[in-house]
């Protein structure tokens, strides 16, 4: 991963929120969310203005658009990782399709090979797989390290940690 990345593929809202918190959302060049699906206002507006390109979700990425957008880092969600049970995925036509574990593995293998061929490093954000809220929030430190904003990320995490302790104290008092 070249640090800092300049043109990022943002797989979903949770990643976009983390980038927004670090004032890095302007690095988003491409996304896996359609405008109507996006809940991050700034990213939704960038999609509308075509400052950010929709390149498809992980099941149907348009690699040519990633190259055209000069993406130099792809941040994907843990959804890309194979699961033991059949997984329902949506396609661009908004229909649902079930993928077997083998199909999921093949999809991941194909995707990683294509990213490698294109010279685009990829990161799988596992924050949504974390059980504890603080563990989810700690992913901000990962993005701080990747984008050279360690101090800002540490401050944000400390703030979240402090708020969590305050909330726990209030719960204990009840």
Can you describe what each PLM-predicted range is?
Residues 7, 51, 68, 72-174:
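Extracytoplasmic substrate-binding proteins
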């Amino acid at each position: 991963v070249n640090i800092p990345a300049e043109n990022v593929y943002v797989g979903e809202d949770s990643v976009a929120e983390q980038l927004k918190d670090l004032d890095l959302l302007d690095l988003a060049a491409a996304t896996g969310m359609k405008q109507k699906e996006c809940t991050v206002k700034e990213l939704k507006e960038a999609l509308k203005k075509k400052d950010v390109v929709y390149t498809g979700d992980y099941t149907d990425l348009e690699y040519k658009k990633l190259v055209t957008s000069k993406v130099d880092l792809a941040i994907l969600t843990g959804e890309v990782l194979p699961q033991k049970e059949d997984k329902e995925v949506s396609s661009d036509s908004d229909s649902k399709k079930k993928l077997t574990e083998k199909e999921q593995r093949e999809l991941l293998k194909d995707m990683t090979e294509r990213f490698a061929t294109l010279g685009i490093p990829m990161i799988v954000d596992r924050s949504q797989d974390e059980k504890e809220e603080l563990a989810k929030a700690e992913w901000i430190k990962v993005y701080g390290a990747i984008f050279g904003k360690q101090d800002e990320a540490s401050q944000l995490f400390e703030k979240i940690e402090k708020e969590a302790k305050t909330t726990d104290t209030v719960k204990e008092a009840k």
